[in-house]
Amino acid sequence: MKASVVLSLLGYLVVPSGAYILGRCTVAKKLHDGGLDYFEGYSLENWVCLAYFESKFNPMAIYENTREGYTGFGLFQMRGSDWCGDHGRNRCHMSCSALLNPNLEKTIKCAKTIVKGKEGMGAWPTWSRYCQYSDTLARWLDGCKL
């Protein structure tokens, strides 16, 4: 009985092959150092919340949304059809693979471009759904040393 419970719990801890998950405080530090804290008025907590709900802190995440016909790239799941690559508008002027680097430099640069637009962070429906009106945003930085 104990062995099956332990094995079940271990199954939840195993990260799929190829995944590169950053810790919450590591993400917060990189975003802070990249100048996102209060960039265009959005707190660092908002950015960390967005990163969690978009990619679960996986900077190498690629998600193909076949229902809506787009592919999201990186920590913030930026749409290839709008923000990166050779076959779309490429508003961030970079390849989509550049958004998959764990150093997050290009990701932060592109995020700044996106949030300067008329929708702000509302450009990410996930932010509107899970972060915008959250009364627990402070938890995203709990215990983090920036």
Swiss-Prot record:
The keyword Disulfide bond applies. Its main location: secreted. The keyword Lipid metabolism does not apply. One of its GO terms (cellular component) is sperm flagellum. May be involved in fertilization. Has no detectable bacteriolytic and lysozyme activities in vitro. Belongs to the glycosyl hydrolase 22 family. This is Lysozyme-like protein 4. The lineage of its organism: Eukaryota, Metazoa, Chordata, Craniata, Vertebrata.
